[in-house]
């Protein structure tokens, strides 16, 4: 932080995208500095516009001294017009077929997806004489989202894939959501290393607090009739007035106080034992607009964690770990309020819980220029909630218990001074819903049932990205993001095929401070179903090209 250094960039790209960013750092005293991050983006994006404005100033003083302080602010506003969905057509075996060009926006000019995020953060670090450190952070924030989007469907619900053409009529339904949260977060943790009982200990202990006062309406559709359109006329400029009644709010407040401690004990020069414990005091209360349905949750939750690390040399380590955790987000449990008093299961259902066992290893390779990680895991989730606002009211719990077994592979770093690689892959050969009260639909479709593989759980997923310095001034790179086939959540009899999306870039250093970079995302313009839902998909981003000029001064 104690350096006068600045960076600015300008990007122009597909969809008439303009983006300017700046990162400015000023020394203001012997141990004080001011930093300012700012950005502006405007993008028509063929109708699905994405405009953003953001600024984040921060000031730090006492840097590196006994008492270090900081204060920062963050503000980001977005004005968008979303592609909410594209309708799918199914093959006889249940395969999801994409139907429309990925970049085509068939919504209305009056659609929008606007967000606002703002928060203030205060920080203090106290350094003790014995090398201990107390790090405290306090943040207050306000977050808003207001979305009114068009749901796209075929007027002829029985149309087949081969019958779709430029004149095919599309309907525009309405989907509206609005929400606001006031959030207070505080965390203070103490860390130190010391010798006790003839062993070296690295201790971390602390407390955190999270307070969320929120209001939501997840079903706030426009009542005004909406015109149809045709496949061959995307972004046709049609608009309707907002005919909705004043918003009716579901409200909730959630509080969580967490206490945690962890000790890493060096048993020998090569063997370390890690033990930790976390306690959460979680409570939340929910109420519908009329106040006729309310629900309260209150739990005291204990999460143990233990691990063993073996480091035979400086270049490798092996570990085994076991841990549990709970979901203490108030948002997760809000959909119980949508049920009637007679069917409300939320109050009687314990909170979401996860349990994870992992065995892995890490290796430093290529003269410590790269890090390789391999891990095997077994994870369980209990009382999994449905957080999809469109379906949670009818199916609040996805499963009583499910598990997944798999492996993760990671490689990051330079294989040679010129060649850089980033690779991650997750393989989940075994995943199953172990307990569920969901009944199998008469037609064999519907939501996943006990014994099924959970939705949105592909066997293979990952990405690889590699760059190579061709000369001292020219660097080129390419990579692929991929995913194998999977089912949507709530649609066990249909599936989306696997896909791979290729990105590429080339960068030229004009001098040691200025460079220009060309990025091509989705190089081969692959059309694929990225987000999967019950009855529709969100298309993956179409091919885009961006040219960025960046300079440091």
Regions found by a protein language model. Give the residues of each.
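Repeated loop/turn-to-beta-strand initiation elements of outer-membrane beta-barrel proteins
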Residues: 31-34, 66-71, 131-134, 198, ...
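Outer-membrane beta-barrel translocator/receptor signature
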Residues: 1-57, 63-68, 118, 370
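C-terminal beta-signal and adjacent terminal beta-strands/loops
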Residues: 416, 473, 481-489, 507-553
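Membrane-embedded beta-barrel scaffold of Gram-negative outer-membrane proteins
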Residues: 125-127, 133-139, 143-151, 317-319, ...
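Gram-negative outer-membrane beta-barrel transporters
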Residues: 369, 373-380, 398-490, 512, ...
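Face-selective signature of the C-terminal outer-membrane beta-barrel domain
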Residues: 120-142, 170-287, 373
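Structural signature of Gram-negative outer-membrane beta-barrels, strongest in the C-terminal barrel
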Residues: 62-64, 181, 200-204, 208-210, ...
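Acidic/polar loop-and-plug regions of large Gram-negative outer-membrane beta-barrel proteins
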Residues: 41-45, 58-62, 66-127, 142-181, ...
